[in-house]
């Protein structure tokens, strides 16, 4: 054992050449424009669900938000406007698959279900598994610890109903 102070640099003793740069975690891939639009739509729906502010004002505020320039504006507008406009219809579509009332859902879960339901019904160019995965990721990012599992289960059942041929072909 050496009396030399430990500098924390193990160098060659740790299997790394002396002077090697410390390993850093790889950067996460950049978010897609559609993912950003979903995140912003979820945030707008969250605001709208909590206080029913004018959706036009919420939309304008989010258009000015930092990072909006990297979002798919058309997809954002379709998601936010469509989910609000069709809230009753979309809720009626996923409500049979809930094990609690809609009012008992967290606002994040409810917003994610609205985004996912809207995409399942209207965005047929997006595979249903992508729609579900994106809603799950939104819930993991913004929701409670286990909420994503619930959103996954509800949207999976809804997909089997509204996209039956696509789901059957994948199973």
From Swiss-Prot:
Signal peptide: none
Keyword Transcription regulation: yes
Top-level taxonomic group: Bacteria
Alphabetic keyword roster: RNA-binding, Transcription, Transcription antitermination, Transcription regulation
Cited SUPFAM superfamilies: NusB-like
Record region (Disordered): 1-36
Gene Ontology biological-process annotations: DNA-templated transcription termination; transcription antitermination
One cellular component (GO) term of this entry: cytosol
Coiled coil: none
GO MF term (any one): RNA binding
Sequence similarity: Belongs to the NusB family.
Free-text function comment from the UniProt entry: Involved in transcription antitermination. Required for transcription of ribosomal RNA (rRNA) genes. Binds specifically to the boxA antiterminator sequence of the ribosomal RNA (rrn) operons.
Protein name: Transcription antitermination protein NusB
Taxonomic source organism: Cupriavidus metallidurans (strain ATCC 43123 / DSM 2839 / NBRC 102507 / CH34)
